[in-house]
Amino acid sequence: MNLKDHIRGIPDFPKPGILFYDISTLIRHADAWQVAMGRLAKVVRAHHPDLLAGVESRGFILAAPLALKLGCGFIMLRKRGKLPGATVGYDYDLEYGQDRIEIQADAVQPGQRVVVVDDLLATGGTMAAGIKLLRKVGAEVPAAAALIELAFLKGRDRLDVPFEALVSYDQ
Protein backbone atom coordinates (compact mmCIF):
# COMPACT_ATOMS: atom_id res chain seq x y z
CA MET A 1 0.00 0.00 0.00
CA ASN A 2 1.27 3.45 -0.89
CA LEU A 3 0.69 5.53 2.23
CA LYS A 4 1.02 8.77 0.24
CA ASP A 5 -2.35 7.93 -1.31
CA HIS A 6 -3.88 8.42 2.15
CA ILE A 7 -2.14 11.68 3.13
CA ARG A 8 -3.63 14.89 1.80
CA GLY A 9 -1.76 18.10 1.19
CA ILE A 10 -3.54 21.29 2.24
CA PRO A 11 -2.03 24.42 0.68
CA ASP A 12 -1.58 27.64 2.63
CA PHE A 13 -2.09 26.07 6.06
CA PRO A 14 -1.33 27.19 8.73
CA LYS A 15 -0.15 30.22 6.75
CA PRO A 16 0.32 31.23 3.11
CA GLY A 17 3.07 29.38 1.29
CA ILE A 18 2.99 26.29 3.54
CA LEU A 19 1.77 22.92 2.25
CA PHE A 20 0.42 21.01 5.26
CA TYR A 21 0.52 17.21 5.10
CA ASP A 22 -2.60 16.02 6.89
CA ILE A 23 -2.46 12.55 8.47
CA SER A 24 -6.13 12.64 9.53
CA THR A 25 -7.04 11.21 6.12
CA LEU A 26 -4.74 8.24 6.79
CA ILE A 27 -5.79 7.49 10.36
CA ARG A 28 -9.50 7.54 9.55
CA HIS A 29 -8.99 4.60 7.16
CA ALA A 30 -8.43 1.52 9.31
CA ASP A 31 -6.53 -0.42 6.63
CA ALA A 32 -4.09 2.42 5.92
CA TRP A 33 -3.57 3.08 9.63
CA GLN A 34 -2.95 -0.63 10.30
CA VAL A 35 -0.35 -0.73 7.51
CA ALA A 36 1.36 2.43 8.78
CA MET A 37 1.45 1.17 12.37
CA GLY A 38 2.78 -2.21 11.25
CA ARG A 39 5.58 -0.57 9.30
CA LEU A 40 6.43 1.80 12.14
CA ALA A 41 6.43 -1.12 14.58
CA LYS A 42 8.98 -2.95 12.43
CA VAL A 43 11.24 0.12 12.30
CA VAL A 44 11.01 0.92 16.02
CA ARG A 45 11.11 -2.66 17.34
CA ALA A 46 14.64 -3.05 15.94
CA HIS A 47 15.86 -0.50 18.54
CA HIS A 48 14.47 -2.44 21.55
CA PRO A 49 12.80 0.51 23.30
CA ASP A 50 11.65 0.56 26.90
CA LEU A 51 9.59 3.68 26.17
CA LEU A 52 8.31 5.63 23.19
CA ALA A 53 8.28 9.41 23.52
CA GLY A 54 5.54 11.06 21.47
CA VAL A 55 6.11 14.65 20.39
CA GLU A 56 3.18 17.02 21.00
CA SER A 57 0.62 16.64 19.71
CA ARG A 58 0.22 14.51 16.60
CA GLY A 59 3.14 12.36 17.70
CA PHE A 60 0.88 11.13 20.52
CA ILE A 61 -1.54 9.69 17.93
CA LEU A 62 1.20 7.42 16.61
CA ALA A 63 3.40 6.76 19.64
CA ALA A 64 0.72 5.70 22.14
CA PRO A 65 -0.84 2.86 20.10
CA LEU A 66 2.59 1.90 18.79
CA ALA A 67 3.90 1.54 22.36
CA LEU A 68 0.92 -0.67 23.19
CA LYS A 69 1.60 -2.80 20.10
CA LEU A 70 5.28 -3.16 21.05
CA GLY A 71 4.62 -3.80 24.75
CA CYS A 72 6.55 -0.79 25.99
CA GLY A 73 5.64 2.39 27.85
CA PHE A 74 4.65 5.76 26.41
CA ILE A 75 5.65 9.25 27.57
CA MET A 76 4.73 12.69 26.28
CA LEU A 77 7.13 15.40 25.14
CA ARG A 78 5.03 18.54 25.65
CA LYS A 79 5.22 22.27 25.32
CA ARG A 80 5.89 24.39 28.39
CA GLY A 81 3.26 24.27 31.12
CA LYS A 82 1.16 21.40 29.73
CA LEU A 83 2.19 18.64 32.17
CA PRO A 84 1.13 18.32 35.82
CA GLY A 85 3.65 17.88 38.61
CA ALA A 86 7.38 18.41 38.53
CA THR A 87 8.85 18.68 35.05
CA VAL A 88 12.25 18.83 33.38
CA GLY A 89 12.63 21.00 30.30
CA TYR A 90 14.92 21.88 27.46
CA ASP A 91 14.95 25.30 25.76
CA TYR A 92 15.67 25.41 22.05
CA ASP A 93 15.88 28.03 19.33
CA LEU A 94 13.24 28.67 16.70
CA GLU A 95 13.66 30.77 13.60
CA TYR A 96 12.32 33.80 15.51
CA GLY A 97 12.68 33.14 19.23
CA GLN A 98 12.76 30.20 21.60
CA ASP A 99 10.53 27.39 22.75
CA ARG A 100 10.66 24.80 25.51
CA ILE A 101 9.85 21.11 25.55
CA GLU A 102 9.17 19.27 28.82
CA ILE A 103 8.63 15.84 30.33
CA GLN A 104 7.47 14.85 33.79
CA ALA A 105 10.48 14.59 36.09
CA ASP A 106 9.81 10.93 36.91
CA ALA A 107 8.92 9.83 33.36
CA VAL A 108 12.26 8.21 32.52
CA GLN A 109 14.69 6.19 34.58
CA PRO A 110 18.40 6.56 33.80
CA GLY A 111 19.50 4.06 31.18
CA GLN A 112 16.05 3.42 29.73
CA ARG A 113 15.97 3.15 25.94
CA VAL A 114 13.59 5.76 24.51
CA VAL A 115 12.69 6.12 20.83
CA VAL A 116 11.22 9.49 19.82
CA VAL A 117 8.16 9.34 17.54
CA ASP A 118 6.37 12.15 15.70
CA ASP A 119 3.97 12.43 12.81
CA LEU A 120 6.29 14.57 10.70
CA LEU A 121 9.92 15.67 10.61
CA ALA A 122 10.39 19.11 9.06
CA THR A 123 13.36 21.21 10.20
CA GLY A 124 14.16 18.79 13.03
CA GLY A 125 14.30 21.40 15.79
CA THR A 126 11.64 19.96 18.05
CA MET A 127 12.74 16.35 17.60
CA ALA A 128 16.39 17.27 18.24
CA ALA A 129 15.33 19.13 21.40
CA GLY A 130 13.35 16.11 22.55
CA ILE A 131 16.39 13.87 22.09
CA LYS A 132 18.55 16.30 24.09
CA LEU A 133 15.95 16.52 26.85
CA LEU A 134 15.74 12.74 27.14
CA ARG A 135 19.52 12.47 27.36
CA LYS A 136 19.52 15.23 29.99
CA VAL A 137 17.48 12.93 32.26
CA GLY A 138 19.72 9.93 31.58
CA ALA A 139 17.84 8.16 28.80
CA GLU A 140 19.54 6.29 26.03
CA VAL A 141 18.02 7.43 22.70
CA PRO A 142 18.83 4.82 20.06
CA ALA A 143 16.62 6.23 17.27
CA ALA A 144 13.79 8.47 16.14
CA ALA A 145 10.98 7.83 13.68
CA ALA A 146 8.13 9.63 11.95
CA LEU A 147 5.35 8.84 9.56
CA ILE A 148 6.39 11.69 7.20
CA GLU A 149 9.68 13.40 6.43
CA LEU A 150 9.95 16.66 4.50
CA ALA A 151 13.36 15.68 3.12
CA PHE A 152 13.94 19.03 1.39
CA LEU A 153 14.12 20.73 4.81
CA LYS A 154 16.99 18.43 5.86
CA GLY A 155 15.70 17.98 9.42
CA ARG A 156 17.43 14.62 9.80
CA ASP A 157 20.75 16.46 9.59
CA ARG A 158 19.97 18.02 13.00
CA LEU A 159 19.48 14.61 14.62
CA ASP A 160 22.39 12.65 16.00
CA VAL A 161 20.51 9.34 16.06
CA PRO A 162 19.35 7.03 13.28
CA PHE A 163 16.07 8.31 11.83
CA GLU A 164 13.48 6.60 9.67
CA ALA A 165 10.27 7.83 8.07
CA LEU A 166 7.65 5.83 6.22
CA VAL A 167 6.94 8.55 3.66
CA SER A 168 9.23 11.23 2.27
CA TYR A 169 8.38 14.37 0.33
CA ASP A 170 11.06 16.19 -1.66
CA GLN A 171 9.19 19.47 -2.07
From Swiss-Prot:
It is an enzyme of class 2 (transferase). GO terms for cellular component: cytoplasm. It catalyses: AMP + diphosphate = 5-phospho-alpha-D-ribose 1-diphosphate + adenine. Pathway: Purine metabolism; AMP biosynthesis via salvage pathway; AMP from adenine: step 1/1. SUPFAM superfamilies: PRTase-like. Its EC number is 2.4.2.7. InterPro entries: Ade_phspho_trans, PRibTrfase_dom, PRTase-like, UPRTase/APRTase. Keywords: Cytoplasm, Glycosyltransferase, Purine salvage, Transferase. Pfam families: Pribosyltran (PF00156). The keyword Glycosyltransferase applies. Its main location: cytoplasm. GO terms for biological process: adenine salvage; AMP salvage; purine ribonucleoside salvage. CDD domains: PRTases_typeI. Homodimer. Belongs to the purine/pyrimidine phosphoribosyltransferase family. This is Adenine phosphoribosyltransferase. The gene is apt.
